[in-house]
């Protein structure tokens, strides 16, 4: 199904042959899910951890990682990185610096350019800057920097990237993937994309930037599923760290 089917209730609707749209909970899938039967929905990585836990026991599994982030984790590196790919790590045993620059992992920034920013959850989470490189790779490690590890889909942006361009690309994705069921997400993603398109083209104003941030804030906490929350991340994250680039687009200075 579509990206929206990352929401468990939308996935269930898709499996039933209906349009992949989330429903308002309750009822929760564990009570009333697929064909109105109790349903447990987990992702593939979670299910892959079940057999070794059954074979070796929960205590064995808890010897890996931290108290809050237990076990191994598959991290995906993409973007401006020398060695893109999937890497299995033990949570808490390494930092983002180790992951990006370690010879057995990312190997450094492509073309030996400077690192500008990291999308630790792809477009679905707030951007971080090089100051967070020494944060441990755990679910809690990026909280001091206002972000999180999420699914571990790490996208690297080098010094040449126009962050307004990057935000516009991500906003377009979320506008396209919104199922349209709830108004804040449907209308919010539409306006965020078109405002970013105008700003990136050099036709925006300072008022457009204010409206963009306001629209993003209005989406938060008002959507049926997490897609709407994810959609504001490109705007909030880029504006938090690179407000000067927005200013340059609309004022030329």
Feature-to-residue mapping (PLM):
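Hydrophobic alpha-helical positions that pack around
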Residues: 1-91
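Extended, hydrophobic alpha-helical segments in both membrane/secreted and soluble proteins
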Residues: 96-99, 114-115, 178, 192
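Ferredoxin-type iron-sulfur electron-transfer modules in oxidoreductases and energy-metabolism complexes
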Residues: 136-253
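Short amphipathic, charge-patterned alpha-helical segments
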Residues: 92-110
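Short, solvent-exposed loop/turn segments at the edges of secondary structure
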Residues: 70-72, 113, 148-152
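Short acidic, glycine/serine/threonine-rich loops at helix termini
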Residues: 4-17, 23-26, 52, 87-89, ...
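Terminal amphipathic helices with adjacent charged low-complexity linkers/tails
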Residues: 108-145, 240
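Hydrophobic alpha-helical scaffolding
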Residues: 1-5, 36-43, 85-90, 108, ...
């Amino acid at each position: 199904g579509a990206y929206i089917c990352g929401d468990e209730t939308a996935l269930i609707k898709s499996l039933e042959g209906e349009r992949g749209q989330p429903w308002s909970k309750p009822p929760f899938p564990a009570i009333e899910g697929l064909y109105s039967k109790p349903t447990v929905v987990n992702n593939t990585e979670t299910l892959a951890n079940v057999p070794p836990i059954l074979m070796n026991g929960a205590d064995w599994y808890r010897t890996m990682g931290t108290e809050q982030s237990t076990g191994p984790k598959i991290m995906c590196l993409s973007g401006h990185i020398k060695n893109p790919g999937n890497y299995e790590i033990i949570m808490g045993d390494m930092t983002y610096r180790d992951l990006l620059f370690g010879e057995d992992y990312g190997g450094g920034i492509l073309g030996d350019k400077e690192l500008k920013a990291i999308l630790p959850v792809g477009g679905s989470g707030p951007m971080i800057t090089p100051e967070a490189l020494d944060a441990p790779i755990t679910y809690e490690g990026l909280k001091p920097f206002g972000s999180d590890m999420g699914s571990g889909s790490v996208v690297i942006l080098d010094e040449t990237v126009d962050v307004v361009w990057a935000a516009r690309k991500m906003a377009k994705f979320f506008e396209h993937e919104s199922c349209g069921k709830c108004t804040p997400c449907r209308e919010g993603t539409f306006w965020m994309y078109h405002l970013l398109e105008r700003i990136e083209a050099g036709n925006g104003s300072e008022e457009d930037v204010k409206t963009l941030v306001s629209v993003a804030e209005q989406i938060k906490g008002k959507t049926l599923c997490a897609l709407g929350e994810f959609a504001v991340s490109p705007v909030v994250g880029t504006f938090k760290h690179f407000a000067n680039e927005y200013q340059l687009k609309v004022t030329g200075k």
